[in-house]
Amino acid sequence: ALIGGSIGGGIAWEMAALAPELTQYLIPIASDWKANDWIIANTFLQKRILQNSKNPIEDARIHAMLTYRTPQSFDYRFGRTKNEELGIFNVESWLLHHGNKLANRFSLPSYVMMNHLLSTINIERDGKSAKKIIGSINAEIHLIAIDSDLFFTPSEDQRTFQMLKQKKENIYYHELKSIHGHDGFLIESDHMAQILKTIF
């Protein structure tokens, strides 16, 4: 099986498109076969931050975290509470923590490359449409979207499913319910496990 979440799902799509007989199951999670205009716009802003910020990885990560969660998720987690020790809101402290954490794990070139890969997801090549390419993939395809995802929106997976269900019998659409947005597939592990159990 090829299973991947977010950019990993985009890479799984690319692998299956390049080798249609590679896998029995293709399971992209919170992802799509292409970077749409919303993804391109956000990765463009990431690129600008990475080029111009004095703290490029930290600041890029802070912006990215806003696309990975939802206002409801932040309300649920933080509720406008303050970190009295630092004199800032807990949501600000949390964002700074994630920025610093990633800066300690990633080099700038690796983050730039990841952002580039995310912005260029696209299985269409050599004049062949996505419909034709996906139709040639032998694998059983399970699209797993998150109902509150503000990054790879569920409407994109729904559009892919509607485009292909008449042409390809073994394509399925699943939707994970979560208030947490794009990161829901990482947070709602029990719900993810339930969906995967229906596949395997």
Regions found by a protein language model. Give the residues of each.
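Short beta-strand/loop motif that positions the catalytic acidic residue
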Residues: I137, L143-A145
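Substrate-recognition/cap regions that form aromatic- and gly/pro-loop-enriched pockets
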Residues: A130-I134, S148, I171-H174
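Alpha/beta-hydrolase-fold enzymes
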Residues: L22-K101
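Conserved hydrolase catalytic core segment
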Residues: A1-D37
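Catalytic active-site module of serine/aspartate enzymes centered on a nucleophile-bearing elbow/loop
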Residues: Q158-F200
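Active-site nucleophile elbow and catalytic-triad environment of alpha/beta-hydrolase enzymes
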Residues: H97-H98, M113-I133
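Conserved alpha/beta-hydrolase "acid-adjacent" motif
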Residues: L150-R159
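Short, conserved loop/helix-junction motifs that constitute active-site signature segments
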Residues: I134-N138, L164-K167
